[in-house]
Amino acid sequence: MTTRYARHPELRLTALDGEGVALHLGTRRYYSVSESGLDLLQALETPRTLDELVAVLMAKYDVTTELATSTTREFLDHGRRTGMLSVEEDA
């Protein structure tokens, strides 16, 4: 089973000085996101797997696989809880 993550269709993203602001139109909530969070949200314009997202961070930042993976997992968990992300699973 492959799990893919994507930005919620009602999420709007704006980049400001290396960080971002996300607005969920459905809930009318704003979220501030870090530079790495902004990178992940931009990558999630199309559905991506955890491994693909880890690769996004590793390509830009000088981090270990373990740190990139834990950072990405935390981001995905938060994104699911807040409704910023949608999750697709296929066989």
Task: Identify what each model region corresponds to.
Residues 1-38, 42, 88-90:
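Acidic, low-complexity/disordered tracts enriched in E/D and polar residues
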Residues 29-91:
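Long, charge-rich, low-complexity alpha-helical segments
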